[in-house]
Each structure stands twice: as structure tokens, then as C-alpha cells.
A protein has these predicted regions:
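Helix-start/capping segments and mature chain N-termini
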Residues: 1-11, 15-22, 45-232
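Short secondary-structure capping/junction motifs at helix and strand boundaries
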Residues: 8-10, 26-37, 67-68
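Short, internal active-site loops enriched in acidic
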Residues: 39-44
């Protein structure tokens, strides 16, 4: 992301990892979130920012669950956002740039006003893209998974991890374009993300889904993988 944004980060990956671990230890965080951020300084206050200094900060805090734990069992409800993911030739879509989250915030706020937990976003062509802060998967009647091709949104680490888990269980995973009108054909749906982890979805607008055994099993396998404890 930094390279795509033209940021020359003044620290190595190892230095940032060491600093992150120190902060986690000093804050006594056991189940939380780590967020490193980088930004340009104020040396140039104009569109051009070639001479600005790159700053880095790391924040961490205890964060048990991104969604209400009860909703993670029953499945969360999504509406379909009026805002769309931008076309890939209009913005560096494959970066963790804060500006890309503006439409996500607007979409989530509108969803919450309507009584939903989150919002499903479409891409510039009207295909299913992702939720406001997580990737999305669907399960069909044959037990196979379908997930949008990440060509206008981030291919999340959790997304790739879950795909790997699914394949290890001999579950077929199709990465493809998905039309909104296909949603009624699926029997299950879930989100994946660093904060969302594996979260079942009970409905998207008028489309209903079941929290099926496949989703529960994938979540349990994911939890086992990311919460491995070192032997004493």
C-alpha cells in the first residue's frame, strides 16, 4: 500500500513488527487490534506533497468482537448500499488508503439507520463486491463456495486464509463475478476480515440465508488457526 501511495516508510518491516509487539505487551492486549498508520507531514500544504516527511504511528486496543457476539451466532443483516466501489482505473483500489473508506462509512451509517448491521457494496459494474470492511462468501445448494473476484477491492488476508481452509476440507471455491440477482440462489453467506473474522450473514435485503454447518466449521477452523497458543 505504501509503495502504491508513493510513501517511503522510514522503518523496516522488522522494526514495525518489533514496535507492535512492544506496544501489545505494554498495553496488556490479549484479544485486540493492531493498527499501524502512515501519513504525510505538513511541510507542503498543497496538492503536491513530494517534500513532505512520512510519519508512522502504531495503535493497539482490546477488541473482543467487531460485531455483537450474539449476532455472530444468529447472523448479521445487510442492506445493499447505494454507494459503489470505484472503478479500478479511478483510484488505487488495492491499497489500505483511508480515503477509500469514506464511502464505506457512509454506507454503514445508512445501513444502521435502516436497522441493519452492515452494508453490501456493489462494484462500478453492478456486481457484488464486499461489505464495508470485509470480504463476502456465499454457499450454494451443492455445498460449494462463491466469492467475488477481487479486482476492485482488497483481497483480504482473512479471505485468502479461509479459501485455503475450505480447499483443505475439499470444499470447492469459485472466485467469479456475482450478480445481485444471484443472491436468492444461495443458501448461506458469511463475511471475512481481520476484525470481522468469519461472521455469518442471515440476510441481505430480502434474501434470507441459514447459518449452516459449513460456515460454523470454517469459523472453528479459522479460530483454531489464529489463536494457536505456544506450549508452556
Amino acid at each position: 500500500s505504501a509503495k502504491r501511495m508513493g510513501f517511503d516508510i522510514p522503518y523496516s518491516e522488522e522494526q514495525i513488527n518489533i514496535a507492535s509487539n512492544k506496544i501489545i505487551a505494554s498495553q496488556n492486549v490479549e484479544n485486540g487490534y493492531v493498527r499501524p498508520v502512515a501519513w504525510r507531514g505538513s511541510e507542503m500544504m498543497a496538492i503536491s506533497a513530494q517534500q513532505t516527511k512520512i510519519h508512522v504511528a502504531i495503535a493497539t486496543w482490546e477488541w473482543g468482537s467487531y460485531f455483537d457476539p450474539k449476532l455472530k451466532v444468529e447472523g448479521i443483516k445487510l442492506n445493499i448500499s447505494n454507494w459503489r466501489r470505484p472503478a479500478p482505473n479511478t483510484i488505487p483500489w488495492d491499497t489500505k488508503a483511508s480515503g477509500l473508506y469514506m464511502i464505506c462509512t457512509l454506507s454503514k451509517h445508512e445501513a444502521e439507520k435502516q436497522g441493519y448491521t452492515d452494508s453490501l457494496m456493489l462494484d462500478h459494474e453492478g456486481n457484488v463486491a464486499e461489505a464495508t470492511g470485509a470480504n463476502v462468501f456465499f454457499k450454494d445448494k451443492n455445498g460449494e463456495l462463491h466469492t467475488p473476484t477481487p479486482d476492485s477491492f482488497l483481497d483480504g488476508i482473512t479471505r485468502r486464509t479461509v479459501i485455503g481452509i475450505a480447499k483443505s476440507k475439499n470444499i470447492k471455491v469459485h472466485e467469479r463475478k456475482i450478480k445481485p440477482e444471484e443472491l436468492s440462489n444461495f443458501v448461506g453467506c458469511f463475511l471475512t476480515g481481520t476484525a470481522a473474522e468469519v461472521t455469518p450473514v442471515s440476510c441481505i435485503a430480502e434474501n434470507q440465508f441459514k447459518v449452516c454447518d459449513t460456515i460454523i466449521d470454517l469459523n472453528e477452523s479459522y479460530q483454531t488457526l489464529v489463536r494457536k497458543k505456544k506450549a508452556a
